[in-house]
Amino acid sequence: HEAIDNGCDMFCVHGPFEFRAIEIYKGKPIFYSLGSFIRQPYQQDIVPWETYSAHKFIDRDYPSENPIDTKIEDAKFLLERTGRHPASYFRGASISCEYSDSKLKKIIIHPVDLGIDGPLSDLGIPKIASEEVANNLLNEIAQLSVPYGTKLEIKDGLGVIKLEQ
């Protein structure tokens, strides 16, 4: 709210891998997270020491603190220790905003699917979400946004937020 109170026209949060609520504050959108748009887990050749340290893999006989020394086997080890990322991390959206006379009139949410259920070669690459994935994501966004008074309509696989005139 403070950013908008100080002149920001839109505020987007980045960091959470999952979609969160959308709020319209003083006619300006706040996207509390747009989910993931491109994601490439499990595909790294090197897992940096900081990752080991963050996950407290103290039982691993790690030969060096040099990230260059970590190889693909370490990525496999990390996956075994942390488990698979949830499917919700592999969904997101592209947003388009329509303005008239410098005022926001409509937000259109285009759901994307990052291929959690597809082949590894497609994992993390954004594609237009199927009707099922799109509807699930849009219904979730609609529910998350209710406490903020944001009404989301679902039409033809897109989410639409119309602002009062």
Summary of predicted features, one role per range:
Residues 10, 29:
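Short, Asp-centered acidic motifs that coordinate Mg2+ and/or phosphate
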Residues 43-165:
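A short C-terminal boundary segment appended to hydrolase-like catalytic domains
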Residues 15, 32, 97:
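Divalent metal-coordination and catalytic microenvironments
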Residues 17, 35-37, 112:
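Active-site beta-loop-alpha junctions enriched in small/polar residues
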Residues 2, 21-24, 85-88:
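Short, conserved, surface-exposed binding loops centered on an aromatic residue
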